[in-house]
Amino acid sequence: LVEVQALVDQSSLGNPRRVALGLEQNRLAMLLAVLHRHGGIAVYDQDVFVNVVGGIRVQETAADLPVLLAVLSSLRDAPLADKTVAFGEVGLSGEIRPVPNGEERLKEAATHGFKRAIVPKGNAPKAGSYKGMDVIAVERLAEALEAC
């Protein structure tokens, strides 16, 4: 598990900055375009800074959804619900794709005290598998944004 932070702020420059620490720069640009196109949330006039806490370099696409939820949280100036975990690959058409080891990710999150999970529908466990954890299965980016 990794923590993803984001800061979104009004840009004073003609070209807003996109800074990604621990994440590929081009991936961030693509995710922001998907957020605009399929989530209806534009950040074209905002500076966007994303940081993976602890200096960890994230290579896998499972971090896509957490990145966009962190951006949304900063943009709204409101934190996600306490003890929320998320994972999922975000496709160019706004679909949330399953990722490898979904079951293991949920087990690990539960052992760390997470009470709410936003996951791809393809990674959703059977109902009641995780007592004490509300697992929200999503197929589209818009659904994930509504769950926040």
Residues of each region from the PLM?
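Peripheral, non-AAA+ core regions of ATP-driven protein-machinery
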Residues: L1-C148
